């Protein structure tokens, strides 16, 4: 992605230099450095100071939220064993790319615009341009990988279990970083620091020709925006359809089972109907219900040599208000998919203006410059960087298990001093085991010894 350069006049001597700006001050000036003149926009000192204060404040807020939020995601996903799933592995890669975008790009974009010149040299110029492109590419490819992984887990669960492992996810993540690194090689090649006035330097993209610039802009628009958008739209559309059919299928199965039980006067032994398979779908077992389930699994019954006490192990059925395990698992999948959809929509909302401005700039530089100079390009700039801080907010508001893991991590990092337990008095009787404890002890003893 090209860096957004905020609107400012070129500092120079003479009346003409004060009216000239670099041709197309969009996205780090991807033109060839020619100057185009236009009437200056007269603004008071108070307006400039207010705009500068707002810009710096928004930059600081976005930077702190991006760095702090993504570091929190990396720490929580790295320390919590319950969150080490395939989907969260891709979310971890997404957090690393967002952190890279914030740390490696935001300071080197804001400071030159505040100082009026790029003081960091050619190496930093090439590195910032390259790392920003890699970060955006990794984020896009990670979202595509998450969509395909969710589609396989929900719509093709039995086939997906062969390859849906954390080791396979690690290989896919490595491939996304390598592919992004190769795709963004033209940025450091065609990026340079050039003078645009007395003691004024800019980090710009110097493409060999206008045709090359146009081809590159269209290529990025297709590879990193249009094609991923279509793939994710199709994948999440099929996922939504499958979840809807699963909920309806589960509801119909429950109605049929209840009518059969009423007609037969109940199932013997309090047994519950097992998982039903139809058209490749299966109803999960009770033990598989969870918030981040990857799909439904075929559970084989395990034989137990120990004596089974049906009176102690039979589940107590009651008309509870909560959903059944199969229905709860489908609802949990809906929550996860809804969270991922919000992440995708926010990502494309943040980067659509940048892609559009890049393409417009490549085909109509003067027109884009006249329309987007000033406040519009500043808004586009901040919106693109805001994509690095929205994911932590989405996780905190829409992922219950992530919130709990955050609390557990904070409790682990800041442990409370242990409370001193009161010592029993000398005349105090020892605790007497309850009836439930005795029942569990007897059952454990019988199960361990087995039938005589």
Curated annotation (Swiss-Prot):
Attached lipid, kind S-palmitoyl cysteine, located at 413
Q: Which domain of life is it from?
A: Eukaryota
An individual GO BP term: positive regulation of cell population proliferation
Ranges per topology, Cytoplasmic: 78-85, 149-168, 241-338, 400-452
Glyco sites are at 7, 28, 34
Task: List the GO molecular function terms.
Answer: gastrin receptor activity; neuropeptide receptor activity
Q: What is this protein called?
A: Gastrin/cholecystokinin type B receptor
Provide the species name.
Oryctolagus cuniculus (Rabbit)
């Amino acid at each position: 992605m090209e860096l957004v350069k905020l609107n400012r006049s070129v500092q120079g001597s003479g009346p003409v230099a004060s009216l000239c700006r670099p041709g197309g001050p969009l996205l780090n000036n991807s033109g060839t450095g020619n100057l185009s003149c236009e009437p200056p926009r007269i603004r008071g000192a108070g307006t400039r100071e207010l705009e500068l204060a707002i810009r710096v404040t928004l930059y600081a807020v976005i930077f702190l939220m991006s760095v702090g939020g993504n570091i929190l995601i990396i720490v929580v996903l790295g320390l919590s064993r319950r969150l080490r799933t395939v989907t969260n592995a891709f979310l971890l890669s997404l957090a690393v790319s967002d952190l890279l975008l914030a740390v490696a790009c935001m300071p080197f974009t804001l400071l030159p615009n505040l100082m009026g010149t790029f003081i960091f040299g050619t190496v930093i110029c090439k590195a910032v341009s390259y790392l920003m492109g890699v970060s955006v590419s990794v984020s896009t490819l990670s979202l595509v990988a998450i969509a395909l992984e969710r589609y396989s887990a929900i719509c093709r669960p039995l086939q997906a279990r062969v390859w849906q492992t954390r080791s396979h996810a690690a290989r896919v993540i490595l491939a996304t970083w390598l592919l992004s690194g190769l795709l963004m090689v033209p940025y450091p090649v065609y990026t340079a620091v050039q003078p645009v006035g007395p003691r004024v330097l800019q980090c710009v993209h110097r493409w060999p020709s206008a045709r090359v610039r146009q081809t590159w802009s269209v290529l990025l628009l297709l590879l990193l925006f249009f094609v991923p958008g279509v793939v994710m739209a199709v994948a999440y559309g099929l996922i939504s359809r499958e979840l809807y059919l699963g909920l309806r299928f589960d509801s119909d199965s429950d109605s049929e089972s209840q009518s059969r039980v009423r007609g037969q006067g109940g199932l013997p032994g309090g047994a519950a109907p097992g998982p039903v398979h139809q058209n490749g779908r299966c109803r999960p077992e009770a033990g598989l219900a969870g918030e981040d389930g990857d799909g439904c699994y075929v559970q084989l019954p395990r034989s137990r040599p120990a004596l089974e006490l049906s009176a102690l192990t039979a589940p107590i059925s009651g008309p509870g208000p909560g959903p059944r395990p199969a229905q709860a698992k489908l609802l949990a999948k809906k929550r996860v998919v809804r969270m991922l959809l919000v992440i995708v929509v926010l990502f494309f909302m943040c980067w659509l203006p940048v892609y559009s401005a890049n393409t417009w700039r490549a085909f109509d530089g003067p027109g884009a410059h006249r329309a987007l100079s000033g406040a519009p390009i500043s808004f586009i700039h901040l919106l693109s960087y805001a994509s690095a801080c929205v994911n932590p907010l989405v996780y905190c508001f829409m992922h219950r298990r992530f919130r709990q893991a955050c609390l557990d991590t904070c409790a682990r990092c800041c442990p409370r001093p242990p409370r001193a337990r009161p010592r029993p008095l000398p005349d105090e009787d020892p605790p007497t085991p309850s009836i439930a404890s005795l029942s569990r002890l007897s059952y454990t003893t019988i199960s361990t010894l087995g039938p005589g």
